[in-house]
């Protein structure tokens, strides 16, 4: 559709992130059959060398952005795990779909691609997972992600909601929410392998 044409043009005429070959990395690393957990982000990081196709994740070449730092702090408080890498590929390979609602962004302009039609595609993915699978944990951090709750059948899935890990809201209920242990407890109750965070 038009959105696709525009997306291609955007990458030709403007600097965009993530690199073209990483736009669909979340769904490549976590195929449908393997999804156990879905963490929903808004759109990719918009500074150089940050976005790598997985929400909240960055490469180890750059410092962890504030939200990711706070996620790691909560992980340490929750499970005593100290993260040494900013790259969340290991989570993705264990069935954690790290899905941004909008998959691309123009450099240094947050949310600049929010009208490119990506959300129809990612909403469809969320709904397909909800409709066709069961006992998936959906993690909705912050008001934007929580708007996606309507796509999820709560009678057969588990939703974890809290404030967003960004510095602006982290003290409003993200710290202390213990999402990682809650996810693993649910997975174990359903006879699934827990995530090695």
Where are these regions (language model features)?
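Flexible, compositionally biased loop and terminal segments
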Residues: 33-35, 83-94, 99, 124-125
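Short clusters of hydrophobic/aromatic residues that line enzyme substrate/ligand-binding pockets
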Residues: 23, 54-56, 88, 175, ...
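A short acidic-Thr-Gly-centered motif at the start of a beta-strand
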Residues: 24-33, 129-131
